[in-house]
Amino acid sequence: MEKTTFRNLLEKRVLLLDGAMGTEIQKFGLSEADFQGNLNINNGHELKGNNDLLVLTRPDVIESIHRSYLAAGADIITTCTFNAQAISQADYGTENLVKRINFEGAKLARKVADEFPQPRFVAGTMGPTTRLLSISDDAEHPEKRAITYDQLLEAYKEQALQLIEGGVDILLVETCLDPINAKAAIAAANNAIELSGRAEVSIMVSATVTDSNARLLSGQNIEAFAEAVASCSKYVDIIGLNCSMGVEAMLPPLRRLAEYTSKYVSVHPNAGLPNQMGQYDASPEKMAT
């Protein structure tokens, strides 16, 4: 029997992505010791909050989260690698662990996905990093940038290669705030796919809009973003939205995107902003409907 690939199934029906990783990790009440594990890191940085390290130090936690999402019916689970590139990991002094984190994170998700009888898929998460190319972080010198395009490209390439080696079906470039960062990530993903010979790997690109006019933090609207990223690689199969301003506020930008692009469209919103009591009005039931 022919193996069901991600692209095959994408043509047939709507696929369900898993939910948040960070908030699920919070439920375990982990300590600094959980993030340190047996890594013997004594660089003066607190590691608690560097969730990507948990694929090395507490794989049981990440495995449990993956399994719970699959048991709930998810078709796709996302790796715990959102900040697992050298640029973000340098803030913790753990950039030397990037290859291990991505490979082990992908391998762990792959193992859990393969436990289930029907085809389940693994998306290797590649976040926006902690540096942006379109916006300066120096108000006194707005022309300055904290990172170069080539540095981003190299960091993303290192990440993408290990995610593919670990067995992902999709490279998910998500929470895109800056189109230039996104282009670097897609170019790196494209390069990694071709170097690995894994042409069946899809690229999924997901932007985060910051206002009702469907603009990214950089000021670009969603149509311009979709046009820019669609042409970056022949492996880009999906363009979508994530996080942003909650379910209801995401619907108008989503409709605009769906009307504009010929690619498949994805959406995975957050719960929006808290109300005056510090609570979220969006319930799981409301999000599901």
What are these regions (language model features)?
Residues 1-289:
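Domain-level signal for soluble alpha/beta catalytic cores
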